[in-house]
């Protein structure tokens, strides 16, 4: 029997301190990693609930275990809300992550050795889009497309030529570091020319898609995948969507379970249901509008300070800063900003001469800062502080000054009041 007063404190002091330190770090640092966000206390409540105790292999109404009547409610809520959010006919909320969602789609639509196309990682793609160090580049034959070296934009004509040359069975449209709108119709046109499936990975922009601020790929793609965190502001997890296609739906279901996973994480699925309910509220669109406004403001300020932005701007929540003309590496910039309590991630830029462990760029995003309540005023201050640090990454006096300002702003805008 467990007493509900049992807590980590005074039981596991090392872990309790690590959690406490992380909570303080989140409150005292400004988060600019584009893939991170803060979930609501409601999402935390669901994810920390007793649903973590329940095994539920299978799908609602078709489980391999008894006692699933209440977790079925949670999963059905998550499914119905996701369908409403994205206008999808089919939804699978069971993938544990975006990577597993992508893997499940590939398993459903491809055979080992089949050819598929995805965006090159150094050009803004994702590991699961065909990187040779990832399962996607090992189990399948991946052909990478990229961006034009002059514009930083996807070269759709070059993409089409590659598709006609290699005849892929699947084309993945999606990114982890691309700041522009994807032309879903053009991707569909190219896929149709070679008889390929089209998969859209909207992990980064799902929240924007849900409220109509970024074009939806659902009408164009055969399958859509996403994470449930990032701009969607839910728990860390995956999601698969598609328009009506009974054959593909059956393949996807069996690919997720039993193909890729056993029992789903019912506490995470419940947290997804909560996040989807929050995303259906009017204020969620207001939040996403501010995310975009903040990203544009950050882009404008950094450009005015002499920093190059890949593609020349942003249409979404992120921007990729090219530091080559500044003579500093992404690794140096990441570390210096970290000392100022500004959290970012180093990132490769197109045709980067440096390794992925060093890089020549930074990826910045506004979802987490916007969740804190930052608007254009705060983002303008913050963007100038970023530039102040990057102007001289070795000036510790200046970095300390910026850190002091960051701490004051963080106290004004707590994450969890």
Curated annotation (Swiss-Prot):
How would you classify this enzyme at the top EC level? transferase
Compartments where found: Cytoplasm
Q: Name one Pfam family in it.
A: SHMT
GO-annotated molecular function: glycine hydroxymethyltransferase activity; pyridoxal phosphate binding
EC numbers on record? 2.1.2.1
Keyword Amino-acid biosynthesis (UniProt): yes
Catalytic activity annotation: (6R)-5,10-methylene-5,6,7,8-tetrahydrofolate + glycine + H2O = (6S)-5,6,7,8-tetrahydrofolate + L-serine
**Oligomeric and partner information:** Homodimer.
UniProt-recorded name of the protein: Serine hydroxymethyltransferase
The species is Legionella pneumophila (strain Corby)
């Amino acid at each position: 029997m467990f007493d509900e007063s049992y807590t980590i404190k005074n039981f596991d002091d090392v872990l309790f301190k690590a959690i406490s330190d992380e909570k303080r770090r989140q409150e005292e640092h400004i988060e600019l990693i584009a893939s991170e966000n803060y979930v609501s206390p409601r999402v935390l409540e669901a994810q920390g609930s007793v649903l973590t105790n329940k095994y539920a292999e299978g799908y609602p109404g078709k489980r391999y275990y008894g006692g699933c009547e209440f977790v079925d409610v949670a999963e059905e809520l998550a499914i119905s809300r996701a369908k409403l959010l994205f206008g999808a006919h089919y939804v699978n909320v069971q993938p544990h992550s975006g990577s597993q969602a992508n893997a499940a789609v590939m398993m459903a639509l491809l055979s080992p050795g089949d050819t598929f196309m995805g965006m090159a990682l150094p050009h803004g793609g994702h590991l699961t889009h065909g990187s040779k160090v990832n399962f996607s580049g090992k189990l399948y034959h991946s052909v990478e497309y990229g961006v034009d070296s002059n514009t930083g934009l996807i070269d759709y004509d070059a993409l089409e030529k590659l598709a006609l040359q290699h005849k892929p069975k699947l084309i993945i449209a999606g990114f982890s570091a691309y700041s522009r709108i994807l032309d879903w119709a053009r991707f569909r046109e190219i896929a149709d020319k070679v008889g390929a499936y089209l998969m859209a990975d909207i992990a980064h922009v799902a929240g924007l898609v849900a409220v109509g601020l970024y074009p939806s790929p659902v009408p164009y793609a055969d399958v859509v995948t996403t994470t449930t965190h990032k701009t969607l502001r839910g728990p860390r997890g995956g999601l698969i969507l598609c328009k009506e296609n009974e054959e593909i739906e059956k393949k996807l279901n069996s690919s997720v379970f039993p193909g890729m996973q056993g029992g789903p994480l019912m506490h995470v699925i419940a947290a997804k249901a909560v996040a989807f309910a929050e995303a259906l509220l009017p204020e969620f669109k207001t939040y996403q509008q501010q995310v975009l406004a903040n990203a544009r403001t950050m882009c404008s300020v950094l450009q005015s300070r002499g920093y190059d932005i890949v593609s020349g701007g942003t249409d979404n929540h992120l921007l990729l800063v090219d530091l080559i003309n500044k003579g500093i590496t992404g690794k140096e910039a990441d570390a210096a900003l970290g000392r100022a309590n500004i959290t970012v991630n180093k990132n490769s830029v197109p045709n980067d001469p440096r390794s992925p462990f060093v890089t020549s760029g930074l990826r910045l995003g506004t979802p987490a800062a916007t969740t804190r309540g930052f608007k254009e005023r705060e983002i303008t201050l913050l963007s100038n502080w970023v530039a102040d640090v990057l102007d001289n990454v070795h000036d510790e006096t200046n970095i300390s000054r910026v850190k002091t300002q960051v701490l004051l702003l963080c106290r004004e805008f707590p994450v969890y009041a």
